């Protein structure tokens, strides 16, 4: 985790009652000091994420899938926010594949302890994804250069 005992979580959802319940659960957690910030609109939340750079984003699945994907893509395309792990808070166990999500939590089973362990795992997963992505990008570039060199060698 971090060296500090404080961990900034950004909660995004459209139900103030659910969000405040989660925020309350996090504030009572004894193993870590969670500081929760809240967003209800994806567009406003995106600008807050860019300004505050939280340690973790917990996103409710209440938004349309296309908006969620766009939100995640904007975070992943920004060098300053690409490492922030994102978890989806789901109301059902229905499988939905969304690139850029490191973890899922069911609303019925949500607890600060599960979040704590999810954060530890998600940070490792996200860092590994970034390393693999960069290595893959580098190898593709090397392959293209090699292909171009071989083509020039035999065509000239």
Spans of features found by a protein language model:
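Conserved phosphotransfer microenvironments
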Residues: 19-20, 41-45, 50-77, 90-92
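Two-component/phosphorelay signaling modules centered on CheY-like receiver
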Residues: 4, 12-37
